[in-house]
Amino acid sequence: MKTSDFDYNLPQEYIAQKPVEPRDSSRLLVLNRQSGELTNRIFGEITDYFKPGDVLVMNDSRVLPARIKGIKQDTSAKIEILLLKRDGEGCWEALLKPGKRTKPGTIIDIHQKGGVVSIQAEVLADKEDGIKLLRFSDETHLMKLGEVPLPPYIHTPVADPERYQTVYALTNGSVAAPTAGLHFTPELLKRLTEMGVICTYVTLHIGLDTFRPVKEEDPKDHKIHREYGILSKETASAICCAKETGKRVFCVGTSATRLVEQASHLSQTSLITSYSGWADLFILPGYKFRVADCFITNFHLPRSTPLMLTSAFAGWPFLRKAYEKAISEHYRFYSFGDAMLIL
């Protein structure tokens, strides 16, 4: 297995620059692993594939207003901060743009819209992959000073920032949306609940690894970034109950899938128990899924870790066939793009 195996060519015009309205009007490509069939549907029709007692697991992490504009105190040059995650000791890991010449000790003034300096950020240290360690003078209003960051391949501003949040987003912490969940509407979730589907939530705060291509020739040499996750006792209980009664677990997105699989591997008393902590499970082809029976996801970037996880679930030959069909039939790709359901 080589990283180049997970490459494919995508015309730029297939990268969705804005979301469709309503959310559940996006297209849905259904992959049936048992029959080998590929079926075109609309996302709002996904209810056809659920049965009473099935469990739907969604990631309720909310995207932080993590893109913050500032001015370097020593040169008065403009600089942009992209918050990644807290380090657990009162500081933040972040990317700076431009960042190469921004050394430890640099002070960044962060202004409110009125032009008054609100807080300052100090660069404390350089870390791997261009990441900087920052400490803010005051975090009380930090989240009010930033904007929700969009993926680097989206060049069109979004009229409503809430369109880059799921309708059930609850807990601030991600720098990228759990995009498979963007297709759900409150009405669709209500229909599923009325059908007897158990809707449950986990929290996994998504980092930049979701966008970064794997650079190592052998993907097994890639070190996936850690992300913080929480899986409640109630969600674990719902999953165990479904498995014990022959029902299925549908995971929405690679983030929810990674967290439930990691929690299952760490559980010593049953299939899965509650969990809170860092998630760093790197799922590659050959992995045996313990929790996820069905999988809802978007179309992913070449050589990316989400694509590798999806390949592990569907099988890369079948998934490649699905991607070829999606490209030939003009599906929309990436964060604001269409979805697939893998049965």
From Swiss-Prot:
Keyword S-adenosyl-L-methionine present in the record's keywords: the answer is: yes
The biological pathway it contributes to is: tRNA modification; tRNA-queuosine biosynthesis
Entry's InterPro entries? QueA (IPR003699), QueA_dom1 (IPR042118), QueA_dom2 (IPR042119), QueA_sf (IPR036100)
**An individual GO BP term:** queuosine biosynthetic process
The UniProt record lists the EC number as 2.4.99.17
Sorted alphabetically, the keyword list is: Cytoplasm, Queuosine biosynthesis, S-adenosyl-L-methionine, Transferase
Its recorded reaction(s) are: 7-aminomethyl-7-carbaguanosine(34) in tRNA + S-adenosyl-L-methionine = epoxyqueuosine(34) in tRNA + adenine + L-methionine + 2 H(+)
This protein's record includes keyword Kinase:
no
Pfam entry (one): Queuosine_synth
Chief location? cytoplasm
Task: Give the Gene3D superfamilies listed for this entry.
Answer: QueA-like (3.40.1780.10)
Q: Which is an annotated GO molecular function term of this record? A: S-adenosylmethionine:tRNA ribosyltransferase-isomerase activity
Q: Name one GO cellular component term.
A: cytoplasm
The protein's location, in the record's own words, is: Cytoplasm
Question: Sorted alphabetically, which NCBIfam families does this protein's record hold?
Answer: PRK00147.1, queA
Family assignment from sequence similarity: Belongs to the QueA family.
Read off the HAMAP family from this record: QueA (MF_00113)
What's the subunit arrangement here? Monomer.
This molecule's function is given as: Transfers and isomerizes the ribose moiety from AdoMet to the 7-aminomethyl group of 7-deazaguanine (preQ1-tRNA) to give epoxyqueuosine (oQ-tRNA).
- By what name is this protein known? S-adenosylmethionine:tRNA ribosyltransferase-isomerase
